[in-house]
Amino acid sequence: MNRFLLRHPLVRTLVELRGNTRACVYTEPMWGLSMNLCLPYASVFMLSFGMSDVQVGIIASIYMFSQTVFAFLSGAIVDRYGRRFSTAFFDFLAWSVPCLIWASSQGFWFFAVAALFNGMMKITTVAWDCLLVEDAPRDKITHIYSWVIIAA
């Protein structure tokens, strides 16, 4: 069984990963699982503050709009500040700051500001994707993305 597994191209890719690619793939479950477990309850959390369905929809729209703006700017920002720094810094701004705002939230405007900050995750996404594939062998990129999808 062990020999069979090690001959499988996906398993072989996972074992042979090095550098930034290995760090990105190996740590993906820590992010993917936690976000997929808690984000669906964000709207329920907002409703518990007495917000209406329309207000929750506006917050979701603000979040989507800020993602669009930051996606447009992300390439220039990542090139300017580098992939690792951009990943670390904007990950903090996109997730830690909104979590602190959500935890101390008093209503609609708190959630709106948190949604604006949370949209910065597009910068992190671009930087992380660059880290994931920049040193990876071209023939392994499909397998690497397969592991990311499996992990999250």
Could you say what each language-model-derived stretch is?
Residues 70-83:
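Helix-to-loop junctions at the C-terminal end of transmembrane segments
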Residues 6-66:
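Helix-loop boundary and gating motifs at the non-cytosolic
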Residues 82, 104-106:
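Helix-breaking motifs and short loop linkers at transmembrane-helix boundaries and internal kinks
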